[in-house]
A protein has these predicted regions:
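Transmembrane alpha-helical core residues of multi-pass small-molecule transporters
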Residues: 57-60, 104, 172-177, 200-208, ...
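Small-residue-rich hydrophobic transmembrane alpha-helices
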Residues: 50-110, 150-166, 276-306
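Hydrophobic/aromatic residues within transmembrane alpha-helices of membrane transport systems
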Residues: 25, 37-41, 53, 78, ...
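Membrane-embedded alpha-helical segments of multi-pass transporters/permeases
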Residues: 32-35, 39, 66, 106-117, ...
Length: 306
């Protein structure tokens, strides 16, 4: 049995790939269960709900990217502090980024719910498609803080030297989504199928964000745990700066999707948006591998810089 790789180890190319494989698998699996979600909606809820989900989904992802920013940016800072040998300060930074991310997620959730309808209308939704997009988005936005935390913890599991545990949580979250999709979307009456799909996704995000919160909130065998902290504007700004590339990459990718949808709904209608949604799912799977690699390597570079 191979020895567990630690951040303090000397990394060769092979060791680095081994260390990042769980992060890559974690992101790919996240993308795959998104595809399964689309499969159930398109096959059981209908074309209009599927088009509505694809229309509003990039907007929901943009709101959740704060988790990527504080995850990749914050994990580099925490890893650097661990490399300097200051574990208490590293845990204070870790706790700060978790609390700020959860608070920001709550604020964005309130704003998102309040402005869902005008934003969906701005994207070109109208009539039945508008109502479907608003319904789906508002259910997902109710648990946005957990979605933000899920993205945040995907990075910090690596920093805590627990990438395999991060993969296990992601698989559990994905299986929750798939099973609930199969139960709710197939068994519920037609008028409730889209709400069932949204509820399945929302509950899976509660698992993905809530389980790590409980794990790090208690005594555990990792090098990180939640503790009392104080507001540190400089640390927050550094995390935002460090994670700005991942933040902008995710925003730009989803913004392009939104712009495509605006034009497609204008010239091709629901069929165009639904067709582009299938292509978007395929693109997500391929890009997930590179995002997973960046999540896995950031703490390594941060630790050795410290």
């Amino acid at each position: 049995m191979k020895q567990q790789i630690q951040l303090s180890d000397h990394f060769t190319y092979g060791r680095l790939i081994r260390f990042t494989l769980p992060s890559i698998g974690m992101m790919i699996f996240t993308s795959i269960y998104g595809v399964v979600d689309g499969f159930f909606v398109s096959n059981y809820a209908g074309k209009t709900p599927f088009a509505a989900v694809n229309l509003i989904y990039p907007l929901l992802m943009i709101l959740a990217t704060a988790g990527f920013m504080f995850g990749t940016g914050g994990s580099a800072i925490v890893a650097k502090t661990l490399g300097e040998g200051d574990k208490p300060r590293a845990n204070r930074y870790f706790s700060l980024f978790v609390y700020v991310s959860a608070g920001l997620g709550a604020i964005l959730a309130v704003l998102g719910i309040a402005f869902t309808r005008p934003l969906a209308r701005l994207l070109g939704a109208e009539g039945e498609m508008l109502e479907a997009a608003v319904l789906y988005a508002r259910i997902i936005l109710l648990v946005l803080p957990f979605n933000v935390l899920q993205m945040l913890f995907q990075s910090f599991f690596v920093t805590a030297e627990k990438p395999q545990l991060g993969l296990a949580v992601t698989v559990s979250s994905g299986m929750t989504n798939m099973i609930l999709d199969a139960v709710l979307v197939i068994l519920l009456p037609q008028e409730y199928k889209l709400a069932g799909a949204a509820a399945a996704t929302a509950l899976s995000q509660v698992v993905g964000g809530g389980v790590p919160l409980l794990y790090f909130g208690r005594n555990n065998d990792s090098i990180l745990h939640l503790s009392r902290t104080a507001c540190d504007g400089k640390a927050i700004a550094r995390a935002c700066a460090n994670g700005s590339s991942e933040f902008m990459s995710n925003i730009s990718m989803n913004l392009v999707g939104m712009l495509y949808n605006i034009q497609l709904i204008k010239y091709a209608g629901e069929d165009g948006v639904a067709a582009y949604g299938v292509l978007m799912y395929v693109s997500m799977i391929f890009s997930a591998a590179f995002i997973g690699y960046s999540i896995g390597t950031a703490p390594v570079f941060g630790y050795h810089d410290g």
